[in-house]
Design a protein with these regions (language model features):
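A short, proline-enriched helix->beta-strand linker immediately N-terminal to the Walker B motif
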Residues: 175-179
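The feature captures the beta-strand-to-loop junction immediately N-terminal to the Walker
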Residues: 45-46
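Conserved ABC transporter NBD signature motif
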Residues: 69-80
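Conserved ABC ATPase "signature" region
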Residues: 132-151
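Catalytic Walker B motif of ABC-type/P-loop ATPase nucleotide-binding domains
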Residues: 181-184
Length: 225
């Protein structure tokens, strides 16, 4: 008996992105097409300035509509992301598609504790009580192998090392078990040993949740791993 082909989590067809320079629209990403199935990993590889991160931001609908223009189609589980109202897109971000950025200090709010920021994901998207959200957040910190998670819940981003901050970002991104994880150079700022640990962690959590991973990097060594 033939095994049915899984439906793609993400389908990108002829995606192009242009930015405005004065009165001129300059195309920086041209006609990208690919599909990504559950549990699969796809790497977008290129040098700095090649449009890798712009592609990811376009998929997430995070580019300013005033100064950028996105053409083509992006479908998540059969829904056209480019056609959705912004309110619906906000619900999808985090719940169905999440992103890990290169430098977690630019994504984590320095004024709030690590635990608070992870708990807010559960409160905002799932309506959990503060007590239950805290319990879930601590469990996630343990899952991403942060030692003494209950104590570190109340620490601020500057009290975490670079590798630990990236683990916290992974916990936040995977909190709601999204169908798609976009990892934008998640190990570039880390030393080789920590880099390997973070890659192993992403692969382990991907296997547990059958998550599709879009991995953005300039490093062929990372792709090989």
């Amino acid at each position: 008996m033939n095994t049915p082909t899984p439906s793609p989590v993400l389908s990108v067809d002829n995606l192009s992105v242009s930015f405005r320079r004065g009165d001129i629209w300059q195309k920086v990403v041209r006609n990208i097409s690919f599909t990504l199935n559950p549990g699969e990993t796809l790497a977008i590889v290129g040098e700095s300035g090649s449009g890798k991160s712009v592609t990811a931001m376009a998929i997430m609908r995070l580019l300013s509509s005033r100064n950028s223009r996105t053409e083509g189609s992006v479908s998540l589980g059969g829904r056209s992301l480019l056609a959705l109202p912004e309110e619906e897109m906000r619900r999808i971000r985090g719940a169905e598609v999440a992103m890990i950025f290169q430098e977690p200090m630019t994504s984590l709010n320095p004024a709030f504790t690590i635990g608070h920021q992870i708990a807010e994901v559960f409160i905002h998207h799932q309506g959990l009580s503060k007590r239950e959200a805290k319990r879930q957040a601590i469990a996630l910190l343990e899952k991403v192998r942060i030692p003494h998670a209950a104590q570190r819940y109340d620490e601020y981003p500057h009290q975490f090392s670079g590798g630990m901050r990236q683990r916290a970002m992974i916990a936040m991104a995977l909190a709601l078990r999204p169908k798609l994880l976009i990892a934008d150079e998640p190990t570039t700022a880390l030393d080789v040993t920590i880099q390997g640990q973070i890659l192993d962690l992403i692969k382990t959590l991907q296997a547990e949740n059958n998550t599709a991973v879009l991995f953005i990097t300039h490093d062929m060594g990372v792709v090989a791993e």
